[in-house]
Amino acid sequence: MGRIEIELQHRGRVPVRKVKVGAFSVSIDGFGAGPRQDLQNPLGVRGTELHDWFFHTEIFKKMHGQNGGTTGIDNDIAAQSFENVAAWILGRNMFGPVRGPWKDDSWKGWWGDNPPYHTPVFVLTHHPRSPLAMEGGTTFHFVTDGLESALKQAKEAAQGKEVRIGGGVSVIRQYLIAGLIDEMHLAVSPVLLGEGEHLFTGISLPQLGFTLVRTVAGESATHVFIKKG
């Protein structure tokens, strides 16, 4: 970011390009995914239980072209997590179960022809692949030169709006450790997993500059908001 843009931000004329984690589900014991993720269990064994609070909401149904769903606190907070987001970053596991070099372009994600992002999505991977344009405005870009490059590209694509780190756990941990996340919204589900991918093992949020902003009790999850500063 250049000196002039920084000065304009201080004057309130340029929006701050926040990098955030939004509506990320964790268990009471701190796991963000279950163990043994595979094609049958993309969120790990029992991982779907973390997201029960979200699956029933109106915003989730709408994102997947369905009608109905519950309204209320959980729905409103989930909907807010998508506001002003103009680019996403995902790990390869979030995109799919394929390992190693891409044999072909047949795998196009877990979400069908119209993924729920509707923005550019930058997928971290060690193996190159051409961009994949989908229905509804989503284009997957496969980034092979690291998390900072992915963030730079996402910020450029977002054009001053927010970048959301979608996960999985490993990617969020990497961005946290690198000091590149500004704020987080965690949806704490009333679930004890006991095993899986732990979100904060070995990470000190206070040392990274995070403070608790607020907590909100939803119908099926407790929403915890933290940010730097």
Residue ranges and their predicted role:
Residues G2-G229:
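Enzymes that bind and transform nitrogen-containing heteroaromatic metabolites
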